[in-house]
Amino acid sequence: MKNYVIQRRYAKALLLIGKEDNNAEQYKEELNGFVSVLDMEKAFESAITNPLYPVEARRKVLDMVIEKLGVSVMMRSFLALLFEKRRIQHVRGINEVYQNLVDELKGIVRADVVSAGELSDDVVEKIRASLSKMTGKQVIVDIAQDPTLIGGIVTKVGDMVLDGSIKTQLSNMKESLKKGERV
């Protein structure tokens, strides 16, 4: 929980600056680009977060990568601040929170849909339209498959989970039968 509080605090601060100078979307792309480099180059992440390396050496590595990425002065300052405050290891979480905040600002919500099998484009579009109607926002749907669901889908939008999987229905029936209830 503590990490989320830290991540949200920095993400909200960056969003305030982004709203103020109308560069929130640019910062979203730059921060996401930096996190992509971390994901691709594990040695880079270790070089900037490992306390066994001297601070100045870590700073030089960070500065070189930031320079190569060609990010804005604001993003350069933001990443330097994270480094100075020893929060650079939270940059992935900050990025995730920031992406969601910018999407929220633009009236976009992300939905994770997990199905037992592959969904046709028509079905995905119907799910998207229905979620959009329900939330009143534009919905971006991320699809995943999980054969253990047996059938149906599980949809997660923010904190709300809609579980229409056969696996859950069977589990609920099993519990009802154990309790001696009618199904």
Swiss-Prot record:
Q: Could you tell me where this protein is found in the cell?
A: Cell inner membrane
The signal peptide, as residue positions, is none
Recorded GO molecular functions are: proton-transporting ATP synthase activity, rotational mechanism
Task: Offer a single GO CC term for the protein.
Answer: proton-transporting ATP synthase complex
Pfam families for this protein = OSCP (PF00213)
Domain of life of the source? Bacteria
The UniProt entry, under InterPro entries, shows: ATP_synth_OSCP/delta_N_sf (IPR026015), ATPase_OSCP/dsu (IPR000711)
UniProt entry keywords in alphabetical sequence? ATP synthesis, Cell inner membrane, Cell membrane, CF(1), Hydrogen ion transport, Ion transport, Membrane, Transport
What does the record say about its membrane topology? Peripheral membrane protein
Q: Chief location of this protein?
A: membrane
Q: To which protein family does this belong? A: Belongs to the ATPase delta chain family.
Q: Which NCBIfam families match?
A: ATP_synt_delta (TIGR01145)
Tell me the subunit arrangement. F-type ATPases have 2 components, F(1) - the catalytic core - and F(0) - the membrane proton channel. F(1) has five subunits: alpha(3), beta(3), gamma(1), delta(1), epsilon(1). F(0) has three main subunits: a(1), b(2) and c(10-14). The alpha and beta chains form an alternating ring which encloses part of the gamma chain. F(1) is attached to F(0) by a central stalk formed by the gamma and epsilon chains, while a peripheral stalk is formed by the delta and b chains.
HAMAP family recorded for this chain? ATP_synth_delta_bact (MF_01416)
According to its UniProt entry, what is the function of this protein?
F(1)F(0) ATP synthase produces ATP from ADP in the presence of a proton or sodium gradient. F-type ATPases consist of two structural domains, F(1) containing the extramembraneous catalytic core and F(0) containing the membrane proton channel, linked together by a central stalk and a peripheral stalk. During catalysis, ATP synthesis in the catalytic domain of F(1) is coupled via a rotary mechanism of the central stalk subunits to proton translocation.
Q: What is this protein called?
A: ATP synthase subunit delta
Instruction: Name its species.
Output: Desulfosudis oleivorans (strain DSM 6200 / JCM 39069 / Hxd3)
